[in-house]
């Protein structure tokens, strides 16, 4: 397992969930929800800079790529690919990777519902919870296979 903090991103149309791993790459935890739109990439860049200011090495950013249950990519995936390309340009030289995020928002909603969070309380953190699930899956995959997860994103 490669050492270093990873940042997990769940990009939605209105909000972006952000999570981080510990430096050993064992556990993903929520960071914040960023409002989608003007300044969103700058905010994510500041999150990475804050990690580095605290002495962490940010190894990579992992972005969830929505696919259908059959594995096909639709319009939402195209939007995420475009976002990830812009993010890669913003955070370079830190690499950005796309990983399969099938069902993470549904799983995050169910998890929060099971914890008794309802309505606005759930909406406020569901994107962070989805980012945690995306990042944790990437960490677990790397630990199991020994290979970096997903596909690398080229800057746009």
Swiss-Prot record:
CDD domains: YqgF. Transmembrane segments: none annotated. The keyword Hydrolase applies. GO terms for cellular component: cytosol. It is found in: Cytoplasm. SUPFAM superfamilies: Ribonuclease H-like. InterPro entries: RNaseH-like_sf, YqgF, YqgF/RNaseH-like_dom, YqgF/RNaseH-like_dom_sf. It is an enzyme of class 3 (hydrolase). Keywords: Cytoplasm, Hydrolase, Nuclease, Ribosome biogenesis. The keyword Hydrolase applies. GO terms for molecular function: nuclease activity. Its EC number is 3.1.-.-. It holds the Pfam family RuvX. One of its GO terms (biological process) is rRNA 5'-end processing. Could be a nuclease involved in processing of the 5'-end of pre-16S rRNA. NCBIfam families: RNAse_H_YqgF. Belongs to the YqgF nuclease family. This is Putative pre-16S rRNA nuclease. The lineage of its organism: Bacteria, Bacillati, Actinomycetota, Actinomycetes, Propionibacteriales.
């Amino acid at each position: 397992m490669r050492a270093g903090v990873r940042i997990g991103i769940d990009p939605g149309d209105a909000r972006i969930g952000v999570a981080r791993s510990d430096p050993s790459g064992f556990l993903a935890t929520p960071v914040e929800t960023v409002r989608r739109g003007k300044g969103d990439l700058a905010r994510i860049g500041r999150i990475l800079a804050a990690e580095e200011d605290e002495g962490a090495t940010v190894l990579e950013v992992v972005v969830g790529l929505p696919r259908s249950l059959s594995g096909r990519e639709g319009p939402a995936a195209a939007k995420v690919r475009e976002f990830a390309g812009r993010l890669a340009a913003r955070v370079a030289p830190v690499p950005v990777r796309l990983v399969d995020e099938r069902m993470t928002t549904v799983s995050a909603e169910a998890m929060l519902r099971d914890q008794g969070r309802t309505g606005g309380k759930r909406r406020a953190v569901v994107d962070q919870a989805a980012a945690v699930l995306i990042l944790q899956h990437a960490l677990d995959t790397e630990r199991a296979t020994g290979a970096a997860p997903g596909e690398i994103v080229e800057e746009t």
